[in-house]
């Protein structure tokens, strides 16, 4: 979610849109101009920031900077290829498609991490299948069980999280380049299909000027559920690391200190961080749900929250 990555995606979307227009041959841009734009399109984050300080509009600042690079080597008096950049598009076409692409990128990372954690829990479930421990209900000793059961329970929960994440990834992998209020009055639907196909996104079958935020809210809800699983695992190990129990503990490397006042302590700080951060993820899901209800075909009340 760095600015550099966002701008790189913006650049690719704008270039692909120009190539789509050239492919159609309707608005006047030639294949040669599209190829020129592809070759010369660049941006400088610092320069974009400087322009935005004046325009107070991030998309205009980016397009201005990108256009300067595209036209820098054009001979004097020749038409400027940058005039075709962003043709018929709105800021939402660019920003929403890029955001969904970023969410896919981020979800892919999370999917791989959840897959790895699930495999670890599955492996440990078999390794510890005969390791006896105390089962507790209401925090009180109940009946004997095995550590393998704990790991197995976590493994299955992570498998369900993985299935939900894969579905949520598919649900958020959408793009929309449909112009003002989503009517395609200023841009041919072919451009949307062309750009989305090359980004690996589906094109939204009916967007307004923005991609409906139920896509994003669904992903946020799944992420909150996954965070709750991590919270559950971390909380269990924290409880088992209590001095009075000490059935399990997180790693504590050589030279690590537990307390400035009590050096004998081995605090479960990593697990506590997991529990704390899970609260942030779950709280952010509520924001995503609130972003679904926008005014008419678009407002930007969601934008500041998403940023």
Please report, for each region that a protein language model flagged, where it lies by residue.
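Buried hydrophobic packing segments
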Residues: 17-18, 103, 107, 223, ...
């Amino acid at each position: 979610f760095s600015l550099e990555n966002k701008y790189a995606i913006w650049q690719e979307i704008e270039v692909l849109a120009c190539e789509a227009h050239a492919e159609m041959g309707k608005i006047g841009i030639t294949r040669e101009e599209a190829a020129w734009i592809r070759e010369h399109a660049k941006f400088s984050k610092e320069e974009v920031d400087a322009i935005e300080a004046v325009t107070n509009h991030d998309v205009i600042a980016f397009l201005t900077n990108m256009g300067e690079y595209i036209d820098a080597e054009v001979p004097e008096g020749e038409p400027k290829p940058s005039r075709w950049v962003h043709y018929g598009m709105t800021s939402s076409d660019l920003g929403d498609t890029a955001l969904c692409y970023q969410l896919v990128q981020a979800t892919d990372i999370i999917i791989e991490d959840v897959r790895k954690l699930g495999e670890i829990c599955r492996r440990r479930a078999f390794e510890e299948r005969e390791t006896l421990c105390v089962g507790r209900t209401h925090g009180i000793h109940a009946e004997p069980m095995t550590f393998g059961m704990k790991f197995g329970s976590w493994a299955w929960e992570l498998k369900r999280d993985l299935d939900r994440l894969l579905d949520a990834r598919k649900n958020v992998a959408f793009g929309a380049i449909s112009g003002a209020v989503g009517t395609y009055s200023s841009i041919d639907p072919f451009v949307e299909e062309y750009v989305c196909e090359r980004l690996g996104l589906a094109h939204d079958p009916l967007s307004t000027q923005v991609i409906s935020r139920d896509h994003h809210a669904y992903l946020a809800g799944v992420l909150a559920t996954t965070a709750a699983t991590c919270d559950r695992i971390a909380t269990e190990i924290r409880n088992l690391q209590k001095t009075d129990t000490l059935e399990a503990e997180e790693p504590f490397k050589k030279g690590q200190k537990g307390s400035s006042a009590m050096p004998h302590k081995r605090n479960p700080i990593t697990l506590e961080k997991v529990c704390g951060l899970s609260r942030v993820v779950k709280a952010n899901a509520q924001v995503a749900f609130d972003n679904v209800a926008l005014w008419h075909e678009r407002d930007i009340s969601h934008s500041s929250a998403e940023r």
